[in-house]
């Protein structure tokens, strides 16, 4: 790319269909630059559009590291539209060299995927790969996220909210994290596996379809990377129906 902010790489895209086109949010990685006193490849969130899902044009930066809690990078977006607002969850990096204490979830809000109306830090603990369910579950807003991604074993869990603003409540998340086991979707077959959410859940006639990354032998040099799918109960997403 001719854009310095995506010259090194563009990957981990999350598409969303809007009208007759597809908007794609993705992680962009710059060439090595001096940023916040460090020289490295800085991650930000790019945006591009397509009519056919193959050819994409109009690449531009949408989310850039500017707040203290994301000062060293913004990674891996996942977007869901609720009532006309796009909720873009991403990994916010606040430390360099990167460490678990500085790798957390943040969210950006946008009405048009052109401008960002607000940003919030979300989890006060180490986490990545959060996304909203596109519809309410039992009358509540629902999200799914991966906790302890950099302090394995990781845990994929479900969170429910009466109000969308609760998503960035520190008190809510502190209470949620204390009872993490109660929110877990048990996807690991054994303690040697690592899992992380891929895309936002899709509602089907049979339940919620969730795609996730699955790594075997995670704590060895013989890691085996894979992609798996699981079907979750429509009214109780912690309940696995098929995989």
Language model region names:
Residues 75:
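Acidic-residue sensor for enzyme active/binding pockets
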Residues 198-200:
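Active-site/ligand-binding surface loops and adjacent short beta/alpha elements
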Residues 1-72, 81-193, 202-243:
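Beta-rich carbohydrate-recognition and catalytic domains
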């Amino acid at each position: 790319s001719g854009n310095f902010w995506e010259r090194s790489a563009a990957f981990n895209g999350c598409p969303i269909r809007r009208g007759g086109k597809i908007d794609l949010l993705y992680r962009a990685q710059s060439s090595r630059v001096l940023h916040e006193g460090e020289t490295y490849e800085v991650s930000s969130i790019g945006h591009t559009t397509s009519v056919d899902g193959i050819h994409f044009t109009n690449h531009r930066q949408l989310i850039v590291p500017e707040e203290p809690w994301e000062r060293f990078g913004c990674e891996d977006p996942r977007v869901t539209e609720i009532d006309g607002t796009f909720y873009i969850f991403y990994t916010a990096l606040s430390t360099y060299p990167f460490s678990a204490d500085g790798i957390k979830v943040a969210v950006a809000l946008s009405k048009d995927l052109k401008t960002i109306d607000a940003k919030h830090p979300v989890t006060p603990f180490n986490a990545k790969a959060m996304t909203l369910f596109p519809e309410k579950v039992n009358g509540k807003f629902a999200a799914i996220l991966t906790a302890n991604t950099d302090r394995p074993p990781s845990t994929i869990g479900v969170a429910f909210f009466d109000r969308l603003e609760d998503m960035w409540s520190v008190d809510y998340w502190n209470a949620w994290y204390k009872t993490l086991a109660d929110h877990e979707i048990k996807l690991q077959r054994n303690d040697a596996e690592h899992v992380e959410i891929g895309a936002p859940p899709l509602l089907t006639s049979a339940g919620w379809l969730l795609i996730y990354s699955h790594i075997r032998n995670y704590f060895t040099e013989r890691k085996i990377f894979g992609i798996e799918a699981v079907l979750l109960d429509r009214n109780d997403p912690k309940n696995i129906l098929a995989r």
